Swiss-Prot record:
Signal peptide: none
Source organism, top-level taxon: Archaea
Annotated source species: Methanocorpusculum labreanum (strain ATCC 43576 / DSM 4855 / Z)
Keywords (A to Z) from UniProt: Protein biosynthesis, Pyridoxal phosphate, Transferase
SUPFAM superfamilies: PLP-dependent transferases
UniProt catalytic activity: O-phospho-L-seryl-tRNA(Cys) + hydrogen sulfide + H(+) = L-cysteinyl-tRNA(Cys) + phosphate
Cofactor: pyridoxal 5'-phosphate
Protein's GO biological process: translation
UniProt name for this protein: O-phospho-L-seryl-tRNA:Cys-tRNA synthase 2
């Protein structure tokens, strides 16, 4: 079915169990779906934008209220809506990092974090991951010390991934923040896989910035995200314009410089707000998500030669599997090669695992019901047995 011209109507979430790691927690709530239809027109959220002419002051829809509520929810002082987490990274580096200045990165960070340093001509110095793919406070301290010796001063910022996108492992955020603050370095908590999925309290963690992704983990349309900060850094990162035209004398009120005046508009903003009540509630039930995830990982581990490449037992629903000794062995002689696994899953209404990959692959069960998790587990077992693999 086409919804317009050559644009096919998307029915992945309705027709399949979707295991794509970046899509699992971004599925819209029914409330967001309705809000998207109602507020889809261009500058719709500007219907009631009056003095001081800034989106976070708009009360209809309740954008202003959302800013206050979300800041409290994250244990921070101020928030700003942004078009995706990457724009939050860019806004922070744009305010804090200068040409040639060092920024500490985890070594397992998303490419957009690196690019946010590159765009301001900064320099990245990485924290070396452990052999089991963790970022530790000791390793962070070593990287900071190395940077101090190299540059003669402390790095301008430390990025910390709460849960990394490669393995879905959890890292020592609170301990790393304490180390960074010993050098007076601000800490950015990258919560794209936690904000909206797990409880997050920035002040308890001791971080200066919390970044969340609306379309990845807060059941919101893309592009959407949140930048939360403390009062101390709000004055710097969320600063307002001071520029003035030399001929006209024009000024621009309290427009924010880092976001070029106005933040998130239209469907991304209203969809994020519409999903928020459910998102606030669901973070309290992550233990149930882990139970469902365990059903699937237990089934996979029962297939001889299969391992969990991520930390184990699992603490997150994004997991990297190592099937080099199981599914990849079959792929070497199967007529479909590495595509046999995704093909077999697709026949069972399961999608989201990268086609052609059988050595190591990621999946995310967030949002699945117990029944769906059991079906998924049974499907992996069936595929293994169909290919004469040892299960038990």
């Amino acid at each position: 079915m086409k919804c317009a011209g050559q644009i096919e109507a998307r029915a992945v979430e309705e027709s399949s169990i979707n295991l794509d790691p970046i899509q699992a927690a971004g599925r819209l709530t029914p409330e967001a779906m309705k809000a998207v239809i109602a507020w889809g027109d261009g500058y719709s959220v500007c219907d009631n934008c009056h003095k001081p002419f800034r989106l976070d002051y708009v009360t209809k829809p309740p954008i202003a209220d959302f800013h206050e509520e979300a800041a409290k929810w994250l244990g921070m002082d101020k928030i700003q809506l942004v078009p995706g987490a990457r724009r939050a990274f860019q806004e922070v580096t744009g305010a804090l990092v200068g040409k040639g200045e060092p920024v500490i990165m985890t070594g397992m960070g998303h490419y957009t974090a690196y690019l946010s340093v590159e765009v301001v001509n900064g320099v990245v110095r990485e924290i070396r991951p452990t052999a089991d793919h963790h970022i530790t406070a000791d390793a962070a301290a070593e990287s900071i010390e190395n940077a101090v010796r190299e540059f003669g001063y402390a790095p301008k910022l430390v990025f910390v991934d709460a849960v990394d996108f490669m393995y879905g492992n959890m890292h020592e955020v609170e301990k790393i923040a304490k180390v960074a603050h010993q050098y007076d370095i601000p800490v950015l908590y990258n919560g794209v896989y936690t904000v909206g999925v797990l409880p997050v309290d920035g002040k308890k963690l001791g971080v200066d910035f919390v970044v969340g992704s609306g379309h990845k983990s807060m059941a919101a349309p893309a592009p959407s995200g949140i930048l939360a900060t403390t009062d101390e850094y709000a004055e710097i990162v969320l600063r307002t314009t001071k520029i003035q035209g030399d001929i006209t004398g024009r000024k621009f009120g309290i427009k924010q410089v880092g976001i070029l005046g106005c933040s998130l508009m239209g469907d991304p903003a209203v969809g994020l707000i519409a999903s928020f009540p459910r998102v606030k509630e669901r973070v309290n039930h992550f233990d149930e998500e882990l139970k469902n995830h365990k059903i699937v990982t237990d089934a996979l581990l029962s297939i001889e030669g299969t391992k969990v490449a991520s930390e184990y037992p699992r603490k997150h629903t994004l997991t990297r599997m190592d099937t080099a000794g199981s599914f990849d062995v079959i792929a070497r002689t199967h007529k479909k090669r590495g595509f046999f696994l995704s093909s077999a899953l697709n026949k069972r209404g399961i999608t989201g695992i990268m086609p052609g990959v059988t050595k190591q692959w990621k999946f995310n069960t967030y949002g699945l019901t117990k029944t769906q998790a059991e079906y998924l587990a049974d499907s992996f077992i069936e595929i293994a047995e169909e290919n004469s693999m040892v299960v038990g």
